């Protein structure tokens, strides 16, 4: 097969591992920077171009689109879809998962365990918003944040009011969530592929830090999932419409709660912690599911 990997970073671990796994299986692989693509959209024959040349036909596309280029990257991916190329994760699923608030609303509708989450627009609503999530300590998150950036733990009510007011004053979109103290600064990353969790790791925050992201100095280790954790991770990925997802959950006193569903999960941490060939499993999944049938994206949710 001819496979396109949409990525701005050909030297990134995840991209290199996917290229390596695909080539080992005899596939032709092209790493394409979505920001270098431009599109011809017409009723006869749509196409994608780079540097004055039309891209050749592809059998499958694996999107590794960074959060900062979600809009343009999704548009390029959608163009591949309109041209009948199989997308490992489609543009609708990616856009849905990148909107943190929308993700929470969709999972709530499906009865998936979540931290109590509040969202408001006016400073006058702040006191009620804080009460809604159980008071301080609480977590304040920028909706556009990634890798733990834009996430604040407010340990007192006064601190919470000040931080929320400041974000509102900057016209930043935030959500407020209950703080799951019993998680002790640890979360679990479940790597979902299709209808299975193929790997999982526990991420522990550094001492004095509550964010467990590996980019923030957290450490990763093997973890044994409960059947409930496995089930809720798969349901969360399905709710987003994703074939591949990194589902982050916390162990709370009332069961697993989903923090985030990542449509472009990194491979380095999960492969390092579990020694599993996750990249190879992804390519095997693409081989089984790529079909040369024109696919039209249908937005749902």
Curated annotation (Swiss-Prot):
Natural source organism: Shewanella baltica (strain OS155 / ATCC BAA-1091)
Encoding gene per record: rimK2
Keywords: ATP-binding, Ligase, Magnesium, Manganese, Metal-binding, Nucleotide-binding, Protein biosynthesis
Binding site for Mg(2+) 1: 248, 260
Pfam families, sorted: RimK, Rimk_N
Domain ATP-grasp: 104-287
Residue sites binding Mn(2+) 2 per the record: 260, 262
Cofactor entry: Mg(2+); Mn(2+)
Cofactor note: Binds 2 magnesium or manganese ions per subunit.
Catalytic EC class: ligase
GO MF terms, alphabetically ordered: ATP binding; metal ion binding; ribosomal S6-glutamic acid ligase activity
Enzyme Commission identifier(s): 6.3.2.-
UniProt-recorded name of the protein: Probable alpha-L-glutamate ligase 2
GTP-binding found in the keyword field: no
């Amino acid at each position: 097969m001819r496979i396109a990997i949409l990525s701005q970073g050909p030297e990134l671990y995840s991209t290199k591992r996917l290229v390596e796994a695909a080539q080992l299986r005899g596939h032709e692989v092209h790493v394409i920077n979505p920001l270098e693509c431009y599109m011809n959209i017409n009723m006869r024959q749509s196409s994608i171009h780079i540097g004055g040349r039309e891209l050749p036909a592809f059998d499958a596309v694996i999107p590794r689109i960074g959060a900062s280029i979600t809009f343009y990257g999704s548009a390029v991916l959608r163009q591949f879809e309109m041209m009948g190329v199989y997308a490992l994760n489609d543009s609708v699923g990616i856009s849905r998962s990148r909107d943190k608030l929308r993700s929470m609303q969709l999972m709530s509708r499906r009865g998936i365990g979540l931290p109590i989450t509040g969202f408001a627009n006016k400073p006058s609503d702040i006191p009620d918003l804080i009460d809604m999530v159980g008071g301080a300590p609480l977590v304040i998150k920028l909706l556009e944040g990634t890798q733990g950036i834009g996430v604040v733990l407010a340990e007192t009510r006064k601190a919470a009011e000040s931080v929320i007011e400041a974000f509102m004053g900057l016209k930043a979109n935030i959500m407020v969530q209950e703080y799951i103290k019993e998680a002790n600064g640890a979360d679990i990353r479940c790597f979902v592929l299709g209808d299975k969790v193929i790997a999982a790791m526990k991420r522990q925050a550094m001492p004095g830090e509550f964010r467990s992201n590996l980019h923030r100095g957290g450490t990763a280790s093997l973890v044994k999932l409960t059947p409930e954790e496995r089930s809720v991770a798969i349901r969360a990925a399905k709710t987003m419409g994703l074939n591949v997802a990194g589902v982050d959950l916390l162990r709370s006193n009332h069961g697993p709660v989903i923090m985030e569903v990542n449509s472009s999960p990194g491979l380095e941490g999960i492969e390092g912690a579990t020694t599993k060939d996750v990249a190879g499993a992804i390519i095997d999944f693409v081989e089984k599911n790529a079909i040369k049938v024109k696919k039209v994206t249908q937005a749902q949710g």
